[in-house]
Regions:
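Charged, glycine/proline-rich intrinsically disordered loops and linkers
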Residues: 68-82, 160-177
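Non-catalytic nucleic-acid-binding/docking modules located in mid-to-C-terminal regions
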Residues: 165-309
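Hydrophobic/aromatic ligand-binding patch that stacks against planar heteroaromatic rings
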Residues: 31, 123-124, 140, 193, ...
Length: 309
């Protein structure tokens, strides 16, 4: 998550380099670690080909929002600037590499996913090497993530959709097995249900089918997915087979030889990167680092499970 200026524009250093992502990352790492949450970061790899259309659409929307932001800026309309700025967030390859370096400087593991980060993180949780995935992307459940935690937000608030106001939020634990039991379906049926409604690989889903109808159809057809998607008129909505999307969720590339190693905070590296290179306040950065040291002295970190008992 990035931190922005009052008008919604990105924070930059004296050389004009964007620093919002680094400020947001530092603040989040510091805050969550001080709440006894042991973090590891998984980064996206190569997106599946079927996701390219969704990514292109997102890119177009951000370009359009940027144009509207510039028009609002010309009129000095701060409210509109904030509104459209929130829709323009884009991470360049350079920004992502900087984020990885900062995470490593804080002594936290960086795992590179071959493809989708949610899929890789799901494997790590399934293997018992982490408590849960901190994500607001429910697609992680389609990759069989046993637990996800939504709204892991340091401020305890988030922006309301298409509004300038905020709402108070709390961490929300979602357990896959409990939800499958509640819905009365299995894992493969959950994937089929999501495909009817729409995923990153078949954006928009099947026209005219909402969550309630999708659940009813999935229960009616059981595991006869050929019949299900024929009834749903998949070929009339997409120019690729339903199996292409289904197989992505079932067989997406994952790195089984990942390594989770936590190290000491490299204060010199953090100071060099944030203070020397990007003009961060030395006092503020030192304060964040000292907060981490205090947490470490108080005892062993216990993990996200402490939030939920």
């Amino acid at each position: 998550s990035s931190i922005r200026q009052r008008d919604g524009s990105f924070l930059t250093d004296s050389k004009g380099n964007v620093t919002s992502h680094l400020m947001g990352l530092m603040s989040r790492i510091s805050n969550l670690t001080q709440q006894n949450i042991r973090l590891a970061f998984v980064f996206d790899g190569e997106p599946p080909k079927l996701k390219h259309m969704t990514l292109e659409r997102r890119k177009e929307l951000k370009i359009e929002a940027q144009k509207k932001f510039e028009k609002a800026k010309e009129k000095a309309d701060e409210e509109l600037m904030k509104k459209y700025a929130a829709r323009t967030s884009r991470l360049s390859d350079e920004m992502i590499e900087e984020a990885k370096k900062l995470v490593e400087a804080f002594g936290l593991p960086v795992i590179e996913a071959p493809s989708e980060a949610e899929a890789q993180a799901s494997l790590i949780v399934k293997n018992g090497d982490a408590f849960a995935i901190a994500t607001n992307d429910a697609d992680a459940l389609l990759f069989e993530a046993p637990k996800i935690v939504r709204n892991v937000n340091m401020a305890g608030k988030k922006k309301r959709a298409n509004k300038l106001s905020f709402e108070t939020i709390n961490p929300d634990l979602i357990e896959l097995e409990a939800n499958l039991r509640h819905l009365g379906i299995g894992q493969e049926q959950l994937i089929a249900l999501a495909m009817l409604i729409g995923t990153d690989y078949n954006s928009g889903g099947i026209k005219g089918i909402g969550p309630k109808t999708a659940l009813k159809m999935v229960k009616n057809y059981g595991n006869d997915f050929d019949a299900l998607f024929k009834e749903a008129k998949w070929p009339e909505n997409f120019n690729f087979e339903w199996k292409a999307v289904f197989d992505l969720f079932k067989n997406i590339p994952m790195n089984k030889d990942y390594s989770l190693k936590w190290k000491d905070v490299d204060e010199d590296k953090i100071m060099s990167m944030l203070v020397d290179e990007h003009d961060f306040s030395e006092e503020r950065v030192k304060s964040q680092i000292e907060g981490l040291a205090d947490t470490k002295q108080k005892g062993k970190q216990k993990g996200l499970g402490e939030f939920f008992g």
